[in-house]
Every structure is written in structure tokens, then in C-alpha cells.
Amino acid sequence: MQRRQIGKLQVSLTGLGCNNFGWRIDEAQSRRVIDAALEAGINLFDTADIYDKGHSEEFLGRALGKRRREIVVATKFGMKFDETRHGAKPEYLRQAAEDSLRRLGTDYIDLYQLHQPDPETPIADTLGALEELKQAGKVREIGCSNFSAAQIREAGGKFASVQNQYSLFHREPEAEVLPECGRQHIAFLPYFPLANGLLTGKYRQGQPLPKGSRGDAGWGPKMFSEENLEKVERLIQFAEERGHTLLELAFSWLAAKPVVASVIAGATTPEQVRANASAAGWKLTSDDLPKIDILMA
């Protein structure tokens, strides 16, 4: 699989989001998903301390075992873990890092990310503590998530990566965040690349939403509107006319962005992992991209 850069780290073009571990799938199934990812050439595993209150990190650490040196472990801190554990104050993040290291069963974190901005803590204080962790060898690179372009600028180029929501149906980062990443040579990691399942191909115009699916959830009617489903049909036709699938279009469109280092996608089965791992290989041309924009208009 193609490799790209996050600072000094070489990462696979598709990364495995570990948010389902413990919440939607148990440890045995999580291990099967991890094994399938490694077999498919994925080396970036993205988790967070709040994913099932630390169980995601624990499952990942135990599954990797002696394979730890082969892969890039990315985790996050800062979202509310409980009433006392949250935010980006130096004293808290130091403890959060130690807790993540223990749960992951490792002595270093490849990419340590601030999960969201903390308005109560000056970013300079947070960055100072993160730099201490780097100097101590406990963290190799630092990143952020859910940051605006202004907040990225305020960090003064200290972050190696930015992880925000981005897909064909959520293009807000294009206005300011992606250009800022380009200016500062910061890697961008899109999450929710399949727009909450809308770009999987499971949801079709004129067909009922599958029971128990994301489309059947409370926010389904808005996301899975007739307008969006019509766009999905146009995208499917575009992909199939060129011998590809909607899934491949969703991943490859993101991979065509120069600042994108790895597309972070969750999975609950080995089959999903294998499909995601091969989905970013379609080389979209300079003629394809504006045509896709027209389809989404």
C-alpha cells in the first residue's frame, strides 16, 4: 500500500479507525479486524482514550503484542473521559499520556493528538507539555483534531497533523483548513470518509433504509435525504462507468488531495477492512475531479 508522511512517520494511505473496539465489537472481533488490517498493508491505527473508556486502546495494545514496532499507533486525549479527566492542561495531559501508554502496553506513542480545542487552556501551555513528552521519547509526533484554520495558525506550526471530518458530503475543510495545512506542510487525516455510511453504496434512492443501520438512526432522515441519495446515484453511475465502485470513489477522491496523508476509516469486520484498504488505489485524473464537483452541486 502507498505510504505518505506525517512528520517523520511513514503511514499507509488508509488508516484503521479503532472507535468501534469495545463499543460495537468485542475484543475477539477487534483482534480479527486488526489482523486483517495488518495483512492488507495498513500500518496506521488511530484510537483515543475516550473510545469505550479506554477499552479500544487496551484491545489494540494486546492485539499488536510483538508487532508493535511494525505499526504507527495514533491516539488522542482531551475529550471528557470523566468528571475530572478532560481538557489540555499540562498536568492533565501528562497523566493522560501515561494512562494511554499503560493501556496500549507500549513505551511510546507515535502520534499523540489533542482531540479537540480546549478554550480554557492557552495552546502554548499544551504545546510545551507535548514537547516535553517528545523530548522524553514518549511521543514521536504531535497532532490535533477538530481544529479550525485559526486555531492551527495559533499553534505556530507545531502540529504534524490535523484530523477533521472530511468527505464528498462534508467539504467544510476545503475553505480554510486544507489551505492552511498546505501552507504549513501539515498532514491532513480525514475521518468519517464515508459520510456516516452514505458513501458505502448500501443506501439507494427508492429503497427503504436498512433496519438497524445508521440511516435508521435519529439523524438518518437529514443525512439520508432524497437530495443526498440522488447525489449518491450520480456518483455510483460515474464510478461504474469507469469500472470502479462508490467506495473506491469516496476513498480515492480524498487520496487525490495532496495534503491528505491517510484516510481514517473504522471497520467492524475483516471484510470491511480489506475493502477499505484497497479502495484508495483509483488514480483520479485532473478531468475527473471537476466532473465530480458538478455531480455534487
Q: For each of these PLM feature ranges, what is it?
A:
Residues 101-120:
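Active-site groove signature of glycoside hydrolases
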Residues 36, 40, 103-104, 137, ...:
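Structural motif
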Residues 22-26, 48-57, 81, 118-122, ...:
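Acidic-and-aromatic substrate-binding clefts and catalytic sites of carbohydrate-active enzymes
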Residues 1-71:
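N-terminal binding-site loop/beta-alpha segment at the start of enzyme catalytic domains
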Residues 6-22, 74-85, 108, 113:
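N-terminal small/glycine-rich loop or linker at the start of catalytic domains
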Residues 25, 29, 55, 59, ...:
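Alpha-helix N-cap and loop-to-helix initiation/capping positions
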Residues 25-37, 88-104, 148, 152-153:
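Short, acidic/polar
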Residues 117-297:
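Beta/alpha (TIM)-barrel catalytic core signal, keyed to glycine-rich beta->alpha loops juxtaposed to Asp/Glu
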